């Protein structure tokens, strides 16, 4: 048996931001805190201007020629960046797979409840796994379950598209629906 891999127990090396004395470029294009261009300035002169205003010199674009620096309050800038990142994480929605279970002999009201649940899941951007459960000898009627799932897909046609057609999996029959990206346009007959 091969030896177990060893894990590096050292703390990860964090990249320090290029501010003030950490900036190593001799010539910099400097923008002040109001967004006004100060032009291409020597690094020491730019640091002097920043210290006179009691602000920091922050490297904004390293790839430009010459590199672009901005005179600003770095603590405030860092706080704003963290706030933006937090908002972006909050807004990003992880798609989940929600499940709607039923039997092939389902009553009208129960079926309508399952359709309502599936609609709610699809509108919130989640995928839906529709499952028909068989017990005992009911598995002989898998054609009725497939018909039920296809009817469900047809009823949810405006909100969803079939990702996986009905198929048997053990003692169940399943079908996957995913939210429709573009609204379905129905054609008029006549």
UniProtKB/Swiss-Prot annotation:
Transmembrane segments: none annotated. The keyword Protein biosynthesis applies. PROSITE patterns: IF3. One of its GO terms (molecular function) is ribosome binding. It is found in: Cytoplasm. One of its GO terms (cellular component) is cytosol. The keyword Protein biosynthesis applies. It comes from the Bacteria. GO terms for biological process: ribosome disassembly. Pfam families: IF3_C, IF3_N. Keywords: Cytoplasm, Initiation factor, Protein biosynthesis. IF-3 binds to the 30S ribosomal subunit and shifts the equilibrium between 70S ribosomes and their 50S and 30S subunits in favor of the free subunits, thus enhancing the availability of 30S subunits on which protein synthesis initiation begins. Monomer. PANTHER family: TRANSLATION INITIATION FACTOR IF-3, TRANSLATION INITIATION FACTOR IF-3, MITOCHONDRIAL. Belongs to the IF-3 family. NCBIfam families: infC. This is Translation initiation factor IF-3. It comes from Prochlorococcus marinus (strain AS9601).
